[in-house]
A protein has these predicted regions:
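Rieske [2Fe-2S] iron-sulfur domain-containing proteins
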Residues: 1-332, 417, 431-436, 441-506
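Structured core elements
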Residues: 196, 206-208, 279-281, 342, ...
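A short, sequence-level motif marking secondary-structure junctions
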Residues: 421-427
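Short, cysteine/histidine-rich loop/knuckle motifs that typically chelate Zn2+
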Residues: 260-264, 349-354, 387
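Histidine-centered nuclease catalytic patch
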Residues: 323-344, 353-383, 394-408, 413
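Short, well-ordered secondary-structure "scaffold" segments embedded in the functional core
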Residues: 391, 404, 431-434
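Histidine-centered divalent metal-coordination motifs
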Residues: 366, 388-389
Length: 506
């Protein structure tokens, strides 16, 4: 009844009329859409400018602190660490992120001032600036660096929109013309070995690894062997037993604990405890299976569902956590195991602003120093990672601890920051007040303690110089090996020089 139009295309004039009609009804460009895009571009440029101004302000703070203290380059926590701590606390970010800002700030001031000006004016993005800094990091000659900075500042604003990979390649071409040994090169695949863990929100984690083939197959065989140690009545699938065998292998166990529940299980005794310990904090009611409250792995964001906590409790070593209440201070400097366990479980992480170092890897710090009469007491103890412990001790930070574990920090610049124990949301009973303590007899001066600062074996500048030298040495070896291979393959005359491959200035 109807003629088929399959395979037939309407004439161009018909398509044009339809497009025109559709555009009149649903115009693609309107004053409203144009204004919205203008706002998007304006705010993106403002974002770039703000990133540049942030680096500039960090650079001014850096200059101020260097003028006040010098580099303190042999100190274990040097001036760089001290400045990073101030920035991290002020911006509520990690020490590592603050250190990254400081690194790019120094690069903008000392190595790439002209490219940095493009960032401050909003002409390039912060991510583009990061790429340029990384791709030029192996240049070790000041004049070459200045020439590359000039060349990139002229080019980068005219380059079209690029992915990070294409931008890196474009920067590499400029670097190669100035200093072939400074071009970033990909290492061999063996160097990309890695092992990563992503924590999920359901008490499970995902694991990804890139290993030597021999190691990977050894792990595979070991998992199969451990999975086979459970009896035939074990309710888990093979893949579930292999997954559980990872934990048994990490604990150094020789057998996988069977879950058949039979008194005469043929699988043998439970595996012996190993050297690897994962600390999980949970309410007793959760351990007993009588409450839905989750548990928490100390030092992570992982929450363990209540049913999994109860299941783990059947095969784990349990240690009750005792709240000290109004107990008197302990004698001596080192807290008892009971008190130390309480402080670590109350705090869960380092108590410096923005730090998430696990409490199990942190020092126990006397807020009021023991030498000034500070008691070994829950109201005067908190967890600090080694880096922030040294920063507090030697870089002019002041702290006050309240009986509920709250710590009030005052930076060398006078800013105030407040941190609460990590257990405050999950286990508020651990934050019940532990009693008042007497104020310190006197405050000692930071200058009197500087002689006790641990020293570095190599300064930050020496580490950077070695890093650059190693990278350049690798690049030179790769280039020379490639040239030798090309000469061996084609022993004829060398090709003419590329006219664009001259030295700077370009």
């Amino acid at each position: 009844m109807f003629e088929s139009t399959e395979g037939r295309r309407p004439p161009p004039e018909v398509i044009a009329r339809l497009d025109a009609m559709f555009e009149r009804v649903y115009p693609a460009s309107t004053p409203e859409s144009a204004a919205l895009l203008e706002r998007i571009c304006s705010w993106s440029r403002a974002e770039n400018q703000a990133a540049g101004q942030r680096l500039a302000a960090i650079g001014e703070l850096d200059t101020l602190r260097l003028r006040q203290y010098g580099e303190r380059e042999t100190w274990w926590t040097d001036t760089w660490d001290s400045i990073s701590a101030e920035i991290a606390a002020a911006l509520q970010i990690s020490q590592a992120q603050a250190s990254s800002y400081l690194n790019y700030s120094r690069a903008m001031r000392n190595r790439l001032p002209k490219v940095g000006s493009a960032l401050v004016s909003g002409d390039i993005s912060y991510s583009a600036f990061q790429t340029i800094v990384f791709r030029t990091d192996l240049i070790d000659d000041a004049e070459v660096m200045a020439a590359v900075d000039t060349a990139l500042a002229l080019r980068v604003q005219r380059w079209p929109t690029m992915t990070r990979g294409r931008l890196a390649a474009a920067v590499d071409r400029v670097v190669a013309r100035a200093d072939r040994d400074a071009v970033r090169r990909r290492r061999k695949q063996q160097a990309s070995r890695e092992f990563s863990i992503w924590d999920g929100g359901d008490g499970l984690s995902e694991v990804h690894a890139r290993l030597f083939a021999t190691d990977a197959h050894a792990v595979d065989a070991r998992l199969n062997a451990l999975a086979g140690t459970a009896c035939e009545s074990d309710p888990r699938t093979l893949q579930q037993r292999r997954a559980d065998a990872v934990g048994a292998m990490a604990a150094g166990a020789e057998r996988l604990q069977c879950r058949c529940g039979q008194p005469n299980c043929s699988a043998g005794a439970s595996p012996a405890p190993g050297p690897v310990v994962i600390h999980v904090v949970a309410n007793q009611s959760t351990v007993d299976g009588a409450a839905p409250d989750p548990g928490a792995i100390v030092g992570t964001d992982v929450l363990i569902p209540a049913e999994l906590v109860a299941q783990l409790a059947d095969s784990s070593r349990l240690r009750p956590l005792v709240h000290p209440g109004e107990a008197s201070p302990e004698r001596g400097y080192v807290p008892s195991r009971t008190l130390a366990d309480f402080v670590r479980c109350r705090d869960l992480t380092c108590r410096f602003p923005g730090c998430d170092c696990p409490a199990t890897e942190a020092d126990l710090d006397h807020t009021i120093p023991h030498s000034q009469g500070g008691p070994t007491h829950a109201s005067n103890l908190k967890c600090l990672c080694r880096q922030h412990h040294l920063i507090k001790t030697f870089w002019g930070w002041q702290d006050q601890q309240l009986p509920d574990g709250t710590v009030i920090w005052r930076s060398p610049s006078g800013q105030t920051y407040v941190t609460t124990p990590g257990s405050a949301l999950l286990f508020p009973s651990l934050c019940a007040p532990t009693g008042e303590i007497a104020p310190p007899r006197q405050r000692d001066r930071v200058a009197d303690r500087t002689a006790m600062m641990p020293r570095r074996r190599r300064t930050r500048a020496e580490n950077r110089a070695k890093y650059i030298a190693d990278g350049r040495r690798h690049n030179r070896a790769v280039r020379q090996a490639r040239q030798s291979a090309q000469q061996a393959a084609s022993p004829g005359p060398a090709p003419p020089d590329d006219p664009d491959d001259g030295p700077p200035p370009f």
